[in-house]
């Protein structure tokens, strides 16, 4: 009888224990399903998985426009918008494309027109209509060279250059929609939306995508650029296929990060392109805060910025030692000078992430950089 009673007790405990396990598992499944692939802008609490532990993290519910309006971005990076117009012709052609128009260069690059993004967003934040109109003029010149399949006629480095321009336009239009001037510039948003959508549909054509991704292989930052270009356009237009492609690019980028936080460029580290990639990944986080990839993207950004901090000298200057692409390694498109190291992408990456996470250590780093490069206390 005692043995039978003991066995019955074991069965009872086993059944209760199984129910508890099932309840716990069901709770986790419901939570994960609720956070998977949601495209709402309002960020809540997400799960960051580290070493098989679920650690809750909080991301700001602020809009991208509000992040762009934070002190250092608004008052330092967007302070001198007139300087961005100096390289632009009255017809809107910008940078290396000016040389192409005057037959001084063999190629033009659609990416050179992406600086309309800074002019428009900076103009929205600082109430500068002249800068906004100059930005639209840059975009207009670019789209004037778009052909029926969505690509840009004989632009150099077609896939990569297009991804730069697409990201800038999609990002700009989304920020306009969040700004107090959304009604004023509604016609411009309506005009550019189908044009940028057509460009992204060209990017994901099987033969175009395959070739473009192959050419992007040595450059980690391009994974996050492509993800932002396609993801933000998908968000803007409601095209879910673009968002799926953007997630592919995010996953590819995540797989490349080294244990020390480096996102490699041409087989090594680069203290400039490190933050360029982070900047685009941060935008992806802002627009897809509840996607199931977010915990890993947040972890990648934290590690990337922590490594970048090791490249900042006590003075606030960014070290170029060992860089594979900037600081005397590669020249800009028109060949007039070597690529510099920041400080724009570095200040933006740290300041923006401080706004998203509320972590003031990133803000302190951004201010340290600002003090050195802009002599602002």
Walk through the language-model features, giving the residues of each.
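Bacterial N-terminal signal peptides
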Residues: 16-30
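N-terminal catalytic cores of secreted or lumenal carbohydrate-active enzymes
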Residues: 96-198, 204
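Extracellular polysaccharide-recognition and catalytic grooves
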Residues: 94, 197-377
